[in-house]
Design a protein with these regions (language model features):
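Short secondary-structure junctions and interdomain/linker hinges
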Residues: 29-33, 75, 79, 100-108, ...
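Short amphipathic alpha-helical segments
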Residues: 86-90, 98-107, 114, 222, ...
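Extended, charged amphipathic alpha-helical segments
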Residues: 195-324
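C-terminal structural cap/anchor segments
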Residues: 297-357
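A general structural signal for short secondary-structure junctions and capping/turn motifs
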Residues: 111-116, 146-149, 164-167, 175, ...
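Extended, helix-rich architectural segments
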Residues: 1-135
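Short, charged/polar micro-motifs that form catalytic or ligand-binding hotspots
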Residues: 112, 281-292, 333-340
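Extended, regular secondary-structure scaffolds
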Residues: 121-215
Length: 357
């Protein structure tokens, strides 16, 4: 979901055509699709092609992106958020709403989404029983519009795709301001048609942004090139072994032989050559030490630059003192401290919207 900034005076003068233009320019942000793909295991290596179609072309995905996000998210919000208030009745009413929305799971998914994409969004609405609900919005399903110089929203655009009974692709668009909501629809990629404008009672734009950091950068976004390099070297290692498993046999001065002769040689486990003859496999050679050192360096760099440690490393054994362990986790503690401050801001806005309605 891209975040765009504009002057408040421009928002007040937006026309139906302006809203359509904003959607056309910002829908389907490629950054989010790529990051979501990497988390789910859809890496660039899977689209790698070789010029020689007969050569081994293993495409191995080592999903460090998922490891980084799952580890950082679990460490950050594995324990549920605890709320406190001097007003016990208010806190109890708020907790009822949270329980109704399975707030603990929602928070986990929001934190994971922010870890992947750098930010994540939530929409508040009233269900058919007039109960307050809040739900995560898919990263490619919304456009967040903020006033220049501020992070609070002036408007938000929600986009939902579906199919009707005739399998037509229906695109529904909602343009939310603090006062009303504009409803649009298009069929099979046609022009958006304004259907209705309705007032709402939230008193604000009912959307919340949860950011991972001030730069809105995902936890593994900065190490994607390292992930790609590791995927390549692992794939090439597999190619190397497969090539050697299927290596050609070079034979010099074997003389005239028949298929029967070859069958007998296989049975006896011996090959008879003429004088000066030779036989050897055509194999590739590689330095195991150099290869393993290179892979080790890539793994270490991914952990260093993501600040997410390798928890399976032998150095995380049970013999570490508390001080030594804190040093090992220092980088992760720092990024989680940033996450906590940013996530708290989103939770506060959620509570403000709930309280206002």
């Amino acid at each position: 979901m891209p975040v765009i900034f504009m002057e408040r005076s421009l928002l007040d003068s937006l026309t139906e055509a302006d809203i359509k233009e904003i959607i056309d320019e910002n829908e389907g942000h490629t950054k989010y699709a790529r990051l979501e793909g990497y988390y789910e295991g859809d890496h660039d290596i899977l689209r790698h092609r070789k010029k020689d179609s007969t050569a081994p072309n293993n495409r191995l995905v080592n999903n460090m992106a998922k490891y980084i996000t799952d580890t950082a998210t679990g460490y950050f919000i594995g324990k549920p958020v605890v709320y406190s208030s001097q007003n016990d009745a208010y806190l109890a009413a708020l907790q009822d709403i949270f329980d109704y929305n399975d707030e603990q799971d929602e928070n986990m998914e929001l934190a994971k989404g922010a870890s992947i994409n750098g930010d994540c969004f939530e929409m508040l609405y009233l269900d058919e029983d007039a109960q307050i609900r809040f739900t995560k919005v898919p990263p490619d399903g919304c456009i967040y519009i903020c006033e220049t110089g501020y992070n609070t929203p002036m408007a938000a655009i929600r986009i939902v795709y579906s199919k009707d009974k005739d399998k037509n692709i229906i695109k529904k668009v909602e343009f939310w301001t603090a006062q009303d909501c504009w409803y649009f629809r298009s069929i099979n990629g046609g022009a958006l048609e304004l259907l209705d404008i309705r007032e709402h009672y939230w008193g604000d734009v009912p959307f919340v942004e949860y950011i991972n950091n001030e730069e809105r950068q995902g936890d593994f976004e900065g190490v994607i090139t390292l992930i790609d390099a590791y995927n390549r070297v692992e794939s090439n290692t597999a190619n190397f072994f497969q090539y050697n498993d299927e290596a050609l046999l070079k034979v010099l001065k074997m003389g005239a032989v028949t298929s029967q002769d070859i069958a007998e040689m296989k049975e006896k486990g011996a090959i008879i050559l003429e004088d000066g003859g030779d036989i050897q496999w055509l194999i590739k050679e590689v330095s195991d030490t150099a290869l393993e050192n290179y892979k080790k360096r890539l793994r270490e760099d991914m952990h260093i630059f993501s600040a997410v440690p390798n928890l399976t490393d032998a150095n995380f054994g049970g013999n570490l003192s508390g001080v030594a362990m804190s040093y090992k986790l220092w980088g992760l503690e720092q990024i989680c401290a940033i996450k906590e401050r940013k996530f708290k801001r989103g939770l506060q806005r959620r509570i403000e919207l709930i309280t206002h309605i």
